[in-house]
Amino acid sequence: MTTPSFIPSVNFHLIKPCNMGCKYCFARFNDVASKSLTRGGLPKEDALAVVSALADFGFEKITFAGGEPTLYPWLTDVIELAKNKGMTTMLVTNGSRLNEAFYLRHAGLLDWITVSIDSLSVGTNLAIGRAKHGNQVFAREDYEVIAAMIHDYSYRLKINTVVSRYNHEEDMNDFIAHAKPERWKVFQALPIVGENDEYLEEFEITAEEFQQFLGRHGSQAKLVKENNDEMRGSYAMVDPKGCFFTNVNGQLEASSPILTVGCDAALREMNYDLTKFHDRGGRYDW
């Protein structure tokens, strides 16, 4: 198999809305006018066409994100199409809408479920804004149940943790050891102009503080870290309007719509960094 000359995995942020309000979220898409979208995302046929274009171009893995992607009414349809076109399929979710019906419905279609878990403390999650409708907060026990069910239904589990001023002193070793994710991505909270900079003083941490969190969890073999520099420009991402976008300059900048100019032309408008993608461990056994 030839090695692609472009980043071979893509994140499709299907939908703008979310049922939580994490202060350091970089994907609020404040420039996306909801009135131009159906329920905050592309209409079904357009979303399917974007997925088809991405698959036909040669992307090998697609991660459906948001907002909160489980709010997207045609989530199953886009996952099924991606799977049928031979892509590895992944979902990034806050876990609030995962249940037995979801696991059964997506069996054989969805390969990975990534759960965003920043803290095991109710108080910390509330401070972060990781609370459903602002007040329904997950505790450690809730996350343990989610992880167990993902394993029980034979999905591959990944956990994403954003390290910020709120949680940088936390110890998650025992939880991670019990949750047994195949991959634990640990991100330094990333400031993005126009998305989360209003809360910058609340969540921003230094490189040293991030390193201290990593050092505390150095025994976790599945940990993959990403600091601010490693994150910028190393992801191929599609926004809820069906445009590629990048964060390389510290703000979100979008391409022309994929369905208007085609995947190749839209991708050429971006300055994604394939070397950075590989350096951060972006290619793995997916």
Curated annotation (Swiss-Prot):
Cofactor dependence: [4Fe-4S] cluster
**In what residue span(s) does the Radical SAM core domain sit?**
2-223
Q: Which reaction does it catalyse?
A: GTP + AH2 + S-adenosyl-L-methionine = 3'-deoxy-3',4'-didehydro-GTP + 5'-deoxyadenosine + L-methionine + A + H2O + H(+)
| Domain of life assignment | Bacteria
Covalent S-S links between cysteines: none
Q: Which Pfam families does the entry link to?
A: Fer4_12, Radical_SAM
Q: What GO molecular function terms would the record report?
A: 4 iron, 4 sulfur cluster binding; lyase activity; metal ion binding
Q: What is its EC number?
A: 4.2.-.-
Please name the GO terms of the biological process aspect recorded for this protein, alphabetically: defense response to virus
Q: What class of enzyme is it?
A: lyase
Q: List UniProt keywords, sorted A-Z.
A: 4Fe-4S, Antiviral defense, Iron, Iron-sulfur, Lyase, Metal-binding, S-adenosyl-L-methionine
UniProt cross-references to InterPro entries, sorted A to Z: Aldolase_TIM (IPR013785), Elp3/MiaA/NifB-like_rSAM (IPR006638), RSAD2/Viperin_antiviral (IPR051196), rSAM (IPR007197)
Q: Where does [4Fe-4S] cluster bind?
A: C18, C22, C25
What is the documented function of this protein?
Expression of pVip21 in E.coli (strain MG1655) confers resistance to phage T7; prevents culture collapse upon infection. Catalyzes the conversion of guanosine triphosphate (GTP) to 3'-deoxy-3',4'-didehydro-GTP (ddhGTP), probably via a SAM-dependent radical mechanism. Overexpression of this protein is not toxic in E.coli, thus modified nucleotides do not affect bacterial transcription machinery.
NCBIfam families from the xrefs? Answer: viperin_w_prok
Family statement: Belongs to the radical SAM superfamily. Viperin family.
By what name is this protein known?
S-adenosylmethionine-dependent nucleotide dehydratase
